[in-house]
């Protein structure tokens, strides 16, 4: 398979972790989101992903999968070991809730396209854009901190999709100077995950396109 991604993209980071946990080899194709106006706008990439976002996962069949959570669910269904969702239905719903707080509430209003719109047409400066980012991360993390049950991962002794979403978000939260001291449970789960080779290999600084 081939993963189209960007080293600092939270969404691509989630999929890298999933591929590593499943021990699935993949080719990395960089889609630099800021260089030369953004490679995602090029015609050749628009033909792969009409949404012009990352990640995209190209399968050996020729099919291309979009959206990180959809890709992760596909990988978990086709390659079930190790499972990324609990067997119990209630626990699955709880894990999905945290994953979706990150992927559906925090991330969409803080992605590069939104931040560029704030700084471009809406004429906010970088400091204002950073404040915007931190505001929504804090609001989301306040909820997540109340929901996770580290032991040592977000929901116990097994890594789940909640961890796959939290670790990339914590990386970018720290980059934008969110005070993680307020979130000891999130920080503990993040630290436990990053001790695992699959997570370490997926870190942004370990990617071929890292800057």
For each predicted feature, which ranges?
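GST-like fold's C-terminal all-alpha helical module
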Residues: 102-195
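Carbohydrate-binding/catalytic loop surfaces
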Residues: 119, 207-211
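Positions that flank functional sites
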Residues: 33-35, 188, 208-209
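GST-like domain detector, emphasizing the conserved glutathione-binding G-site
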Residues: 1-128
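Active-site-flanking alpha-helical
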Residues: 76, 169-170, 203
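Short beta-strand(s) of the beta-wing in winged-helix/HTH DNA-binding folds
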Residues: 55-58, 154, 200
């Amino acid at each position: 398979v081939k993963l189209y991604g960007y080293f600092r993209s939270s969404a691509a980071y989630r999929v890298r972790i999933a591929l590593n946990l499943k021990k699935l080899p993949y080719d990395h194709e960089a889609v630099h989101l800021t260089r030369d106006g953004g490679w995602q706008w090029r015609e050749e990439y628009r033909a792969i992903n009409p949404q012009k976002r990352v990640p995209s996962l190209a399968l050996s069949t020729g099919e291309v999968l979009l959206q990180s959570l959809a890709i992760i669910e596909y990988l978990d269904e086709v390659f079930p070991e190790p499972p990324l969702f609990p067997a119990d239905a209630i626990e699955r719903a709880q894990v999905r809730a945290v994953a979706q707080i990150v992927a559906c509430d925090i991330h969409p209003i803080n992605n590069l396209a939104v931040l560029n719109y704030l700084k471009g047409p809406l004429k906010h400066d970088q400091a204002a854009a950073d404040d915007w980012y931190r505001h929504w991360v804090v609001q989301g993390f306040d909820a997540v901190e109340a929901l996770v049950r580290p032991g040592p991962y977000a929901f116990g002794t097994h890594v789940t999709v909640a961890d796959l979403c939290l670790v990339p978000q914590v990386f970018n939260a720290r980059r934008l100077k969110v005070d993680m001291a307020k979130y000891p449970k999130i920080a503990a789960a993040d630290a436990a995950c990053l001790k695992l080779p699959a997570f370490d290999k997926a870190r942004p600084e370990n990617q071929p396109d890292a800057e």
